[in-house]
């Protein structure tokens, strides 16, 4: 079973495809959907086109996405909500449903500590998947952690 994990952002969107076969987990691909334009509507189009490519290039079975977190800047929250809405619609059109996990749930699932740092999550992601090289930026590690969180619940 291939699971797509998505860490939505307003500048980049981390993604990871993890394959679960019984108890075995394997990282198939991870990266960023990079947003190049500064115009919101065009950013949303770039994001959804990036998702389209992932859907077409991989036989994805399930999708998991990080739930919104609290931010101090209301403009950031509104912009992120617009991105999440577009991402959610694209996923629903393609798959009919998806799972959402809060940052606390992801940290708890991957590290055993809901207050873990991003660096601790990155360390455990590498360890759980037996990845030797550095995974950067942390948006990618977060997306992998989201996919792993979903895999644990299957």
From Swiss-Prot:
Its main location: cytoplasm. Its cofactor is Mg(2+). Gene3D superfamilies: Ribonuclease H-like superfamily/Ribonuclease H. Signal peptide: none annotated. It is an enzyme of class 3 (hydrolase). Belongs to the RuvC family. This is Crossover junction endodeoxyribonuclease RuvC.
């Amino acid at each position: 079973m291939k699971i797509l994990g998505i860490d939505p952002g307003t500048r980049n969107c981390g993604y990871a495809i993890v394959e679960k076969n019984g108890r075995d987990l394997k990282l198939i691909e991870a990266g960023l959907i990079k947003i190049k334009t500064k115009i919101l509507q065009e950013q949303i189009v770039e994001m959804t086109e990036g998702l389209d490519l992932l859907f077409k290039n991989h036989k994805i079975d399930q999708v998991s996405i990080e739930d919104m977190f609290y931010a101090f800047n209301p403009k950031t929250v509104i912009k992120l909500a617009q991105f999440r809405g577009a991402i959610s619609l694209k996923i629903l059109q393609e798959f009919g449903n998806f799972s959402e996990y809060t940052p606390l749930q992801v940290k708890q699932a991957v590290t055993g500590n809901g207050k873990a740092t991003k660096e601790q999550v990155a360390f455990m992601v590498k360890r759980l998947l037996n990845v030797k090289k550095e995974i950067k930026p942390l948006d990618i590690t977060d997306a992998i952690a989201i996919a792993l969180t979903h895999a644990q619940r299957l």
